[in-house]
């Protein structure tokens, strides 16, 4: 009995053989749809037949949603599928991945071959994609002069960003002459110094959209220096122009949205930016004001003499050190002269004495001149420093009639800091005055 297989075991073995056969994983079939049914789940169940044979088939919802037509009983179709076994009934059947109406199969093969070649050449590489400007000044629109596409694009641009200049370039999008016209219009638009170019049309069959799969059109988009937005057909339509363009839009309306900012959002952004700038400027002004008040309250500005008292003392110390140094050098020189004088032979005493006296006189004159020059230069530098300090001195300002107002030991710089009956202190050039505010008058222009 162990040599006998169950029906289930046999069916599983046959299914295993089917699933392991690479020739059955992707087969291309053509035939007629019969017994066609669409389940409530979205899956499709049908038979594919020709004059001599029939095979069961099904297509899952995920693949069925990608169809570019609505299949029906009697349609002649081209199918890509895998072959397997439905274990419950023991029947082999096909699981369909792709399905197209027969008659355009050659177009799809041509499309896939060209797509593969252009991809190999790098035309679809991300590194070639140009950025779409955020705030375009000029937009070139290449599409038919009539139809829903141009209306959708213009109405969307006008509602979102009416400031932009729109250049309509009427273009053939269907027919035998459309390919060359699209290429020429792309090259022309590329000379207009536009910020972005929209190339597209409304939806249609694969034959209607085929001009946007032509190699010449694809290369024209690739070679354009102007950023290109492709907007061909509906969301489920894909052409080679979509792959080579800098951005692919699902519809002409979406292309207009991608190409333009929203004026409402821009207005809100500008208002928020203005508010942020105002807050930042006010914060800077307040910080500077606090810093100025802090500096004005610094004790050296309350007692201006502190700014230059130490400099005067340093000058006096320098003069004392200089005089001491000169005196020391002079005494050393005189000692050397006396020492040399004592060594002079008696017979040359008179001559040496005269020469020594003359040298001492010359040395004395030279030292006096040096001392005078050093003292004069020091006085000039000191005078310049005192003059600079006086120009900054509040005391010097008070000599011209100005007064420093203090309240609670804080310098008052504005009438807004005072109120009636406030006790204040007025610091003048020769003393201080205590006073009480009777009335405050504010200059409202500041």
From Swiss-Prot:
Keyword field:
Cytoplasm, Exonuclease, Hydrolase, Nuclease
The record's GO CC annotations read: cytoplasm; exodeoxyribonuclease VII complex
For this protein, the Enzyme Commission number is 3.1.11.6
Subcellular compartments? Cytoplasm
* Major subcellular site: cytoplasm
Highest taxon above the source species: Bacteria
Q: Which family does it belong to?
A: Belongs to the XseA family.
Protein name according to UniProt: Exodeoxyribonuclease 7 large subunit
User: Which organism encodes this protein?
Assistant: Staphylococcus carnosus (strain TM300)
Q: Which gene encodes it?
A: xseA
């Amino acid at each position: 009995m162990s040599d006998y297989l169950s029906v289930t075991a046999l069916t599983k073995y046959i299914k295993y053989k089917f699933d392991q056969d690479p020739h059955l994983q992707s087969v291309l079939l053509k035939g007629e749809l019969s017994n066609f049914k669409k389940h409530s789940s979205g899956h499709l169940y049908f038979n594919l037949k020709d004059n001599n044979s029939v095979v069961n088939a099904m297509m899952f919802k995920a693949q069925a949603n990608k169809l570019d037509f609505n299949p029906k009983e009697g349609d002649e179709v081209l199918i890509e599928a895998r072959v397997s076994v439905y274990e419950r009934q023991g029947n082999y059947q096909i699981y369909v991945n792709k399905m197209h109406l027969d008659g355009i199969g050659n177009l799809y093969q041509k499309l896939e071959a060209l797509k593969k070649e252009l991809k190999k050449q790098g035309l679809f590489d991300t590194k070639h994609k140009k950025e779409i400007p955020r705030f375009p000044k000029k937009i070139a629109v290449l599409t038919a002069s009539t139809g829903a596409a141009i209306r959708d694009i213009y109405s969307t641009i006008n509602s979102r960003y009416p400031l932009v200049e729109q250049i309509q370039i009427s273009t053939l999008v269907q027919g035998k002459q459309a390919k060359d016209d699209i290429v020429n219009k792309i090259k022309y638009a590329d000379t207009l110094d536009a910020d972005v170019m929209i190339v597209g049309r409304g939806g249609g069959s694969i034959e209607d959209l085929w001009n946007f799969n032509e190699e010449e059109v694809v290369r024209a988009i690739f070679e354009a220096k102007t950023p290109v937005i492709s907007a061909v057909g509906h969301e489920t339509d894909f052409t080679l122009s979509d792959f080579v363009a800098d951005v692919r839009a699902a519809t002409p309306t979406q292309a207009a949205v991608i190409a333009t900012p929203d004026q409402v959002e821009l207005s809100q952004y500008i208002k928020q930016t203005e508010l942020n700038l105002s807050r930042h400027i006010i914060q800077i002004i307040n910080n500077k004001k606090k810093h100025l008040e802090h500096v004005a309250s610094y004790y050296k500005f309350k007692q201006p003499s502190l700014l230059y008292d130490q400099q005067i003392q340093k000058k006096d110390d320098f003069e004392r050190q200089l005089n001491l140094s000169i005196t020391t050098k002079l005494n050393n020189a005189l000692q050397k002269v006396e020492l040399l004088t004592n060594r002079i032979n008696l017979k040359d005493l008179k001559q040496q004495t005269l020469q020594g006296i003359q040298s001492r006189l010359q040395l004395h004159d030279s030292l006096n001149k040096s001392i005078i020059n050093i003292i004069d230069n020091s006085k000039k530098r000191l005078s310049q420093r005192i003059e600079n300090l006086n120009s900054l001195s509040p005391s010097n300002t008070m000599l011209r009639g100005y007064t420093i107002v203090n309240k609670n030991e804080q310098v008052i710089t504005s009438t807004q800091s005072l109120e009636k009956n406030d006790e204040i202190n007025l610091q003048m050039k020769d003393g201080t005055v205590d006073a009480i505010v009777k009335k405050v008058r504010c200059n409202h222009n500041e």
